[in-house]
Amino acid sequence: MSTILDRIKAYKLEEIAARKAERPLVAVEDAARAAPAPRGFARALSTAAATGYGLIAEIKKASPSKGLIREDFDVPALARAYETGGATCLSVLTDGPSFQGADDFLRQAREAVKLPCLRKDFLYDTYQVAEARALGADCILIIMASVTDSQALELEAAASHWGMDVLVEVHSRDELARAEHLKSRLIGINNRNLDTFEVSLDVTRDLARRVPEDRLIVSESGLYTPEDLADLARYGARCFLIGESLMRQADVEAATRAILADPLTAQGGV
């Protein structure tokens, strides 16, 4: 029985083949070389985490499990709201079929703010890495559940070639062990199982203590309150990727500011 991730991979491979036929790699590489210099995604998170939390705020219109998340979807306005609200970096969905994302969303977001941007997509081919840089991405995502070890190494090497950082995403102890063979400092612990789309913060609680000390932990998915962040910070997570819970709010700037608040302050304590 195929999983959601299996179905995504199947259409992604078809999409990659179609894009290669439409736009040769040499043209994508020319665009990548002409793109503005990378902004330093990992550096920004590390700096923020040294004195507080590093927040990757996600621009996401829909998801396979929840359907449409936000109808009022003005990408530049959302990007500016996140920046003003205190986000460290942005994550922008560019996958169309499952997330109603688009390449242009990444371009729009990066042009609207000064924050480093992650291209949030399912990457299987180094063509997509060059494409990410051409779109202005400062970081790419490698999902260990969806690639082989050799693919992960190739994608990481391509990102390094283009001066981009890599967020390596894991959901299990086995995936974490595999991720440790990569050079990237950013380890994303996804609290969502990509086969079932079930979410549990216990995933971060279990895996965070197993992450090498020289890596920077980013907890992803299922984060709704300052208490959630404070809880996971006790396990070593100082950076967080948050999308849906912020996207559903009418005032995204205020919601961003609120989730970054100290839990005691948010409750009227000291």
Swiss-Prot record:
Pathway: Amino-acid biosynthesis; L-tryptophan biosynthesis; L-tryptophan from chorismate: step 4/5. GO terms for biological process: L-tryptophan biosynthetic process. Keywords: Amino-acid biosynthesis, Aromatic amino acid biosynthesis, Decarboxylase, Lyase, Tryptophan biosynthesis. The keyword Transmembrane helix does not apply. Signal peptide: none annotated. Its EC number is 4.1.1.48. It comes from the Bacteria. It is an enzyme of class 4 (lyase). Belongs to the TrpC family. This is Indole-3-glycerol phosphate synthase. The gene is trpC.
